[in-house]
């Protein structure tokens, strides 16, 4: 690809997760950490840090994309870890870990929440991104996803997510104003840091 366009950049996206042990049993701790570290397998192979027979090289990754949602932290073979719980790992710490591991620019390739929690989730993610940036992580963007409400992927529930509603009886999509206000607020904060 770079022969055709030397300026092309390879941008990838993988989930960012945290998996905690359900108890302090040594085997449970080891298994949880092994599962958690599995999130790095793709980037390790692409960059040549593991499985060198696959031909990976650091030049194959220009930007690290990370998908992060409220349900991306859980106990091994168990439930989601709620934000604020002592086992919940701050997103900023997770971003710094990835930045130090790969020394590449990062962007949040997918993030968002459902219902009335959408603005608070974006506020949290942006605060954590700024925290990671203050510790040296190069984070170049955040992608709110999905941008519109949608029917559930594996059931018929209606997922009120993103900035815009489903198409209403007037044939239009309408913005969710609390999230629109939070987006503007976060844009102003980031602009003030530039």
Please give the residue ranges for each predicted region.
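Active-site region of glycoside hydrolase catalytic domains
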Residues: 1-118, 127, 131-194
């Amino acid at each position: 690809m770079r022969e055709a366009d030397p300026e092309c950049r390879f941008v990838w996206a993988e989930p960012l997760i945290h998996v905690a042990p359900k108890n302090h049993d040594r085997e449970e701790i080891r298994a949880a950490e092994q599962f958690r570290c599995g999130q790095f397998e793709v980037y390790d192979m692409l960059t040549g840090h593991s499985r060198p027979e696959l031909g990976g090289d650091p030049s194959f990754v220009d930007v690290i994309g990370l998908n992060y949602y409220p349900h991306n932290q859980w106990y091994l073979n168990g439930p989601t870890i709620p934000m604020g719980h002592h086992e919940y790992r701050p997103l900023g710490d997770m971003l710094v870990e990835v930045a130090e591991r790969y020394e590449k620019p990062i962007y949040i390739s997918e993030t968002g929440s459902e219902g009335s929690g959408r603005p608070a989730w974006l506020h949290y993610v942006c605060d954590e991104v700024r925290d990671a940036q203050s510790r040296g992580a190069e984070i170049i963007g955040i992608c709110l996803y999905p941008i519109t409400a949608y029917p559930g992927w594996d059931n018929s529930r209606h997922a009120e997510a993103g900035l815009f509603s489903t198409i209403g009886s007037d044939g239009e999509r309408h913005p969710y104003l609390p999230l629109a206000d939070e987006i503007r607020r976060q844009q102003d904060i980031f602009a003030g840091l530039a």
